[in-house]
């Protein structure tokens, strides 16, 4: 099923930004789970921080796209990007995705 962007009130450019915010949130969730819950890392601290800084800036620049986004909104509201310690590492989707990446890291490094 395709989504009509006009129905969502988003331009194609806004949709790209929305998807980038969702991607960066996903990366913060999964890689924080790997680090804090599973005691491993498949990206460097510098790479994680680069993604965190980009997400912080995107959320600052486009707050209208982050309101009621439906992707872990409460955890990223007023998020500074300083740490992922408070994120929901034991959330079923987060944990499953982190374990998948850990098990397949030779094929997926730096992707999610």
List the predicted regions and their residue ranges.
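Phosphate/adenylate-binding "loop-and-lid" substructures adjacent to NTP/NAD/dNTP-binding pockets
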Residues: 1-112
